[in-house]
Amino acid sequence: MARDLEAVIAAADQALRTWKPVWTPFLDGALLEQAQERLAGLAELEIASRGGYPGAERQRLLLQRHDAAIAADEVAIGLMGLELGGNFLFDPAERQDFRSGLLALGAGEGELGDLWLRGDRGAQAILTAAQAAALDGRTAMVRTVEVALEARPLHELQLPAPRLPRRFQTVEASLRLDAVASAGFGLSRNRMAELIRQGRVRLNWQPVSSPSRQLTVGDRVQLEGRGELQLETVTATKRERWRIELVRC
């Protein structure tokens, strides 16, 4: 991550030196927050972010000199959609399986934006226009399934519905990560524990592999494709359980 952050800082320096807008590669949520915090102190730098649709998890930062900044939506970002079509009825795949298939074809991590599943028919993704063009018409192997790749304009994609913040309460026997996250993300506790052990869950953007990890107020739990949970309040009940107020976004 340190190398990726240095690349963002170098892009900011380029924008300031050349007085021209610069788009970074796609950044994940952790790096996006870290980069924004690191660059926030530069008063002469204007920062915006875009990922191809509202609520995108992976986004690119637009870096501009404040004195010469123009509206972010007026700066060409060069994004394209990609259809990943195949029959996954008998061999269901996860998002990471599709991402790994694209990386195996030589796609750059920073060229790949969000990717979402389309049932047993495959997936769709947002990429840089250049990367989508390079993959258009090729095939990839995702698990045991051959997948056809087709570049598409963004408006032809079936984009995920915008995720609006939702506040709710749950009562749990413990503050274990698997218990709270399963309630918050609407998955079974066994499935959540499996995802945690697989490294698919992050706690405050840091990798975590122990389902029994204890949570505290202020903790944030991230799960790719399902957003983030924030622990707002925790109070003990008379029956020695925990009433937890969560915000999912």
Region roles according to the model:
Residues M1-D178, G184, P207, V221, ...:
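Ferredoxin-like alpha/beta domains used as RNA- or RNAP-binding modules
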Residues N190-V201:
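Short, basic/aromatic beta-hairpin or loop at an interaction surface
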Residues L215-G218:
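Loop/turn positions that initiate beta-strands
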